[in-house]
Structures are given as C-alpha cells and as structure tokens.
Curated annotation (Swiss-Prot):
<keyword id="KW-0804">Transcription</keyword>
<dbReference type="GO" id="GO:0004252">
    <property type="term" value="F:serine-type endopeptidase activity"/>
</dbReference>
<keyword id="KW-0678">Repressor</keyword>
<keyword id="KW-0227">DNA damage</keyword>
<feature type="active site" description="For autocatalytic cleavage activity">
    <location>
        <position position="191"/>
    </location>
</feature>
<dbReference type="InterPro" id="IPR006200">
    <property type="entry name" value="LexA"/>
</dbReference>
<keyword id="KW-0378">Hydrolase</keyword>
<feature type="site" description="Cleavage; by autolysis">
    <location>
        <begin position="117"/>
        <end position="118"/>
    </location>
</feature>
<dbReference type="GO" id="GO:0006281">
    <property type="term" value="P:DNA repair"/>
</dbReference>
<comment type="subunit">
    <text>Homodimer.</text>
</comment>
<comment type="similarity">
    <text>Belongs to the peptidase S24 family.</text>
</comment>
<dbReference type="GO" id="GO:0001217">
    <property type="term" value="F:DNA-binding transcription repressor activity"/>
</dbReference>
<dbReference type="InterPro" id="IPR006199">
    <property type="entry name" value="LexA_DNA-bd_dom"/>
</dbReference>
<dbReference type="InterPro" id="IPR036286">
    <property type="entry name" value="LexA/Signal_pep-like_sf"/>
</dbReference>
<dbReference type="InterPro" id="IPR036390">
    <property type="entry name" value="WH_DNA-bd_sf"/>
</dbReference>
<feature type="active site" description="For autocatalytic cleavage activity">
    <location>
        <position position="153"/>
    </location>
</feature>
<dbReference type="GO" id="GO:0006508">
    <property type="term" value="P:proteolysis"/>
</dbReference>
Length: 232
C-alpha cells in the first residue's frame, strides 16, 4: 500500500510525462510536494522503485519509467509505460552533410552529456552528439558510451577538464577502477572507486578535493573508464 506522498509523487510524474514527454527534475518534484530537501524525494522515488511502480533507467540522472499505476490512478486497462527519449540508440545517427565516413578502425559512440570530475552534478543527460572512437578502446560486444568531463579533480590521473571519456556500461567495479558513479540517485561523478567493507570511497586524483566515503546503498555504478579522447 502506498503512502499519500508516494501517490502524490507518482501522480505528478505521470502528469508531467503525459504533458512534456519527460519526467520532472528532483527540484520540481520537491516543489510540487512541498518538501524541504531532495533527499525526501529520493526516498520516495526509491520506495516507488522497490514496490515496482517506477524504474530508473541507466545513463540518465533524471530518467524514470512508470511501470504500473495503483488502481486509484490507473486510467483503465491497457496502460503502457512511457519511456523518455534520449537513451542509447541501437545505431548511430546519420552523418551530417559534409561529414566524412568514419574508417572501419573506429566506431561512433553517443556522447551522453557531461560528467563532473569535481563536485558531483546532475550530469548525465540526453545524447548531444556522436564521437568517433578507435575500436581498440572498446571491449568486444559490451555497450559503451562517452561523456564530456567538467572539472579538475582527476587531473593527476591524466583526465583534464574538456576531455571526453569512453565508458563501458557495467554496474560493478573493482577497487582502483575509475568509474561513473551515481550518488543518491541524481548526482553523477567520475572518481576512483574503493570498497571499504560496507562503505564506498570515491577518490579524487587532485589533493584539492576530499575523498567522499558513502554507504554502499548511496552509490550506483554506471560504468568504468576504458579510454579518453582529447582535442587540441
């Protein structure tokens, strides 16, 4: 059985997706439900996800899919979940006019948005463009995507502001891996991953930034760094 706030949030998400085709942000949810902080929204979203009413989609910090509705909200039989656009496509977009075809030794990957190498930000968003990546960076049939780096917290690992990182999609990591981590369900960051018992440490590669140590249920791995592209 859902609480009143859970029903209100589900109703708000459904209405916004029906109107705009995309779910509301955590800030918009907070204002709509008159809550003081986004942590309250995070708890409500997690509860709805655990009960099977919504599902969070990978690589999009705001990506929510309505799986089912309670009887009090259902419009009748035949309800179909509405998925927001902008998830990773099966095929790259057509080449723009005047562009040259990429050689067989490279493949085009979608650039899914920006990732913070600094203070975590609500970062991963819709596909902005595609980028040619050498096939030697990629691992077999695994799914990959790219992100633009913003910030300088990983400079001692050779990752600079403005670089494009190539990420292999995976939901687990080994200590020492540089990963895309989603913190509290809405903040995305690029950091070195360390497990310490039931805690996760997200380490910067810049002494100006502190290591963040969080409970494991607050951190969701979105992928592992496998390559980097830099423009001069």
């Amino acid at each position: 059985m859902l609480t009143r706030k859970q029903i209100q949030l589900l109703e708000f998400i459904q209405a916004r997706m029906a109107r705009d085709g995309v779910p509301p942000s955590f800030d918009e949810m907070k204002l709509a439900l008159d809550l003081r902080s986004k942590s309250g929204i995070h708890r409500l979203v997690t509860a709805l996800e655990e009960r099977g009413f919504i599902r969070r989609l990978p690589h999009r910090a705001r990506a929510l899919e309505i799986v089912r509705l309670p009887e009090s909200l259902s419009k009748g039989p035949g309800f179909q979940p509405r998925v927001i656009e902008g998830t990773m496509p099966d095929r790259p977009a057509p080449l723009p006019r005047g562009a040259m075809e990429v050689s067989v030794s490279a493949i085009e990957l979608p650039v899914m948005g920006r990732i913070a190498a600094g203070v975590p930000i609500e970062a991963i968003s819709e596909i902005s463009h595609h980028i040619a990546v050498p096939t030697t960076m990629l691992s077999g049939q695994d799914r990959h995507y790219a992100l633009e780096v913003r910030g300088d917290s990983m400079i001692e690992a050779g990752i600079n502001d403005g670089d494009v990182v190539v990420i292999r999609e995976q939901n687990a990591a080994e200590s020492g891996d540089i990963v895309v981590a989603l913190v509290d369900g809405y903040e995305a960051t690029l950091k070195r991953y360390r497990r310490k018992g039931n805690m996760i440490a997200l380490e910067a590669a810049n002494p100006a930034y502190e290591t963040r140590v969080l409970p494991e249920d607050k951190v969701r791995i979105q992928g592992r760094l496998v390559g980097l592209i830099r423009s001069y």
